[in-house]
Amino acid sequence: MFARKNIPNQLTMLRLVFAAAFFGVLQLYRYQAEPASPVWVLPVATVLFILAAITDALDGYLARRWEVVSKFGRIMDPFCDKILILGAVIYLGSPRFLDPVAVADGSFRTMVSGVYPWMVVLVLARELLVTGIRGEVEKAGIDFSANWIGKLKMILQSVVVPVVLVVVMIDPNRDPGNGYAWLGWVRDVLVYATVIATVLSGLPYVTGGIRAFKRLKPEPEGSA
């Protein structure tokens, strides 16, 4: 029973290890760099991210199934999620995925990842806002668990990152006549859908936080 109790938390911490390895591998990549980045970088990064995402699906499921949900898990699980996802978004929106040819041509599609700095700002802002609201509300003893759209957001984020990396590997922009140009549009649709879902998933937390703060607001002195 002791070993079973610790497996979900061990999976959570394993996700942090996978995330660190994922960032370390991506640190070796730069689009159209001279000399070229090692060919194994993006495939290995993709596998590491998928493994990290699998641990995210497993740790919560096993904790609930075995009824071993812990305070450690409630804190570290979302923390590791944010490290993995936010780190991935920051890397994908960084100059490492900037297309110098598109920049020189004055194209508006300058990121081979399809992730732009303004998207990174929106995702970071959403996470910071929700984390702040949740911290204040749960400090008062009110449950503020993830809602269904928040879970959908996490699924989309977990899918879009490996898809983006695979599209960058295929690189439909390098040769528009290679028949893979449609992959760029698939990437863009998924990226924009994920950004929209990320922003919208924060709205229930904002409205729920406002209602919770109103309930927690102390009554004026002398009121009945």
Locations of the language-model features?
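Core segments of transmembrane alpha-helices
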Residues: L14-F22, P78-L92, L128-T131, K153-L165
